[in-house]
Amino acid sequence: MSYAIFKHGGKQYKVVEGDIVLLDKMDKEPKALVELVEVLAVSKEGKLSFGKPFVNGAKIEAEVINEGRGKKVITFKKRRRKDSKTKRGFRRDFTRVRITKIVA
């Protein structure tokens, strides 16, 4: 089973072909093809190769499925006996992609 570890938007993801991953918003149309070139490690046929920092010639091809927004995350901070409170909400924008091919 071959897999790859890549970096996108400051986060690292471990994927195999056919996986569906939520990445940070990329402003791409659905069915568009995307190449992810910041590949940190690739495992093919039991051989693991690491990059310094990226693997030379390795890339991951993915197809955009759709874009969306995540569930709202509420942060609430209350300072007792001070009549002071703060409430904030946050929704993450994401792009859902399907990994089609790992090229190493």
UniProtKB/Swiss-Prot annotation:
GO terms for biological process: translation. GO terms for molecular function: rRNA binding; structural constituent of ribosome. Coiled coil: none annotated. InterPro entries: bL21-like, bL21-like_sf, Ribosomal_bL21, Ribosomal_bL21_CS. Keywords: Ribonucleoprotein, Ribosomal protein, RNA-binding, rRNA-binding. The keyword Nucleotide-binding does not apply. Pfam families: Ribosomal_L21p. It comes from the Bacteria. One of its GO terms (cellular component) is ribonucleoprotein complex. The keyword Ribosomal protein applies. NCBIfam families: L21 (TIGR00061). Belongs to the bacterial ribosomal protein bL21 family. Part of the 50S ribosomal subunit. Contacts protein L20. This protein binds to 23S rRNA in the presence of protein L20. This is Large ribosomal subunit protein bL21. The gene is rplU.
